[in-house]
């Protein structure tokens, strides 16, 4: 059972431009982000594959701007829950929490923000999605529009990082 998953990260938002941690906060694409996505041109075959997307507006809007007319929303593709860190700049969190923050960042897949989820938990959320894709799209390519934290977790699963 072989399937291929092509992954696209959503376009930039105002929070991306300010360096703020977004997580599940539903921030739309910025005007600059919309223009950046509109300048991209995907290969013609992209319109012929099945697409899934995060439920967050920035991912859905990215798909629409790319000309993808049909997308299945899958909650498992939602961005990492960064809990209490959402809306903050990482530099500010490091300044506020000092060594505690640096120690947290060294935890890798087990880094868990207060009130949030770890990359390992994101991997656990994604594994059933990957099995579903493999079962329903045998020998086919499927596209996904999602977020940086999810893409990092997908890479972790693909590479066997722990």
Regions found by a protein language model. Give the residues of each.
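Active-site-adjacent alpha-helix immediately C-terminal to a catalytic or transition-state-stabilizing loop
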Residues: 2, 14, 60, 68, ...
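Short beta-strand scaffold positions
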Residues: 53-54, 124, 145-146
